Design a protein with these regions (language model features):
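Hydrophobic residues within membrane-embedded alpha-helical segments of Major Facilitator Superfamily
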Residues: 13, 17, 24-29, 58, ...
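Helix-loop-helix hairpins in multi-pass membrane proteins, especially solute transporters
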Residues: 66, 70-196
């Protein structure tokens, strides 16, 4: 097997748990409710925080990869993903599990752009690169589809933390393989990181989602729910204005 396809296998191996973790807890709500004494609202955050934080962090992590090189970003993201998985598996309360899932999302947000950059730098020929990207997309959709199945099997035979603990040996193997196989990509120091804008975007998303969930459940006073929603909308508006005025925006708003 050529080095190109070995590199692709290593990249896909690290991407599998990232995709699975997006949906692996969808069947675990009853188990988590009993084991951690989680409320309905806490269960929603345990499940949703991963996708919400990852969505907000992918773009700045891509910029970070430009600064430090995407191989380093891949190894750093894998290490954070493994540590967060261990913390999640050992979480004693719902709040610590939510925090661990948020950290897990940060690691995942590093891995996603790093894998795409690795594919782009590994396959110079367009037809091979397109095939590699197709396999990457298939692994992502397949991992998300099989997440509930994997979660159900593990919960049937082991304790709830096993859905996270299984990531740890995978990450250790992946780090060893990728450190040796994946080529180093050159860093581009001039790429702005815009971490503040990324944090504002995440805060805006979380506030808007929180206000929507609170409105549906009636947990907060209507005026307070509206205030949180307005705060989230104001932050989102500020983020969009910054992107429109930036010379090198994280998101090119003209595409929408």
């Amino acid at each position: 097997m050529s080095r190109q396809w070995m590199t692709l296998m290593a990249i896909l191996l690290v991407y599998i748990p990232v995709a699975i973790d997006a949906t692996v807890l969808h069947v675990a709500a009853p188990t988590l409710s009993v084991a951690l004494g989680s409320s309905g609202n806490e269960l929603l955050w345990i499940i949703d925080i991963y996708s919400l934080v990852m969505a907000g962090m992918v773009l700045p992590m891509g910029a970070l990869g430009d600064k430090i090189g995407f191989k380093r970003l891949l190894l750093l993201g894998s290490a954070i993903f493994g540590i967060a998985s261990l913390c999640a598996a050992l979480s004693p309360t719902a709040m610590t599990l939510i925090a661990s899932r948020a950290l897990l999302a940060v690691g995942a947000a590093m891995i996603v752009p790093a894998t795409l950059a690795g594919i782009r730098s590994t396959f110079a020929e367009a037809s091979q690169r397109n095939m590699a990207l197709g396999l990457w997309a298939a692994v992502g959709s397949g991992g998300a589809a099989f997440g509930p199945l994997v979660g159900g099997i593990l919960l049937e035979h082991f304790y709830w933390g096993s859905v996270f603990l299984i990531n740890v040996p995978i990450v250790l193997v992946v780090i060893a393989i990728n450190a040796k196989v994946v080529p180093r990509q050159p860093a581009r120091r001039e790429q702005p990181l815009n971490l503040l804008q990324a944090l504002v975007l995440i805060a805006a998303i979380l506030m808007l989602v929180f206000s929507a969930k609170s409105a549906l459940k009636g947990q907060l006073a209507l005026w307070l729910t509206a205030l949180v929603a307005l705060g989230g909308a104001a932050m989102l508006t500020w983020f969009i204005r910054k992107q429109l005025s930036a010379a090198r925006p994280m998101v090119d708003m003209r595409l929408f």
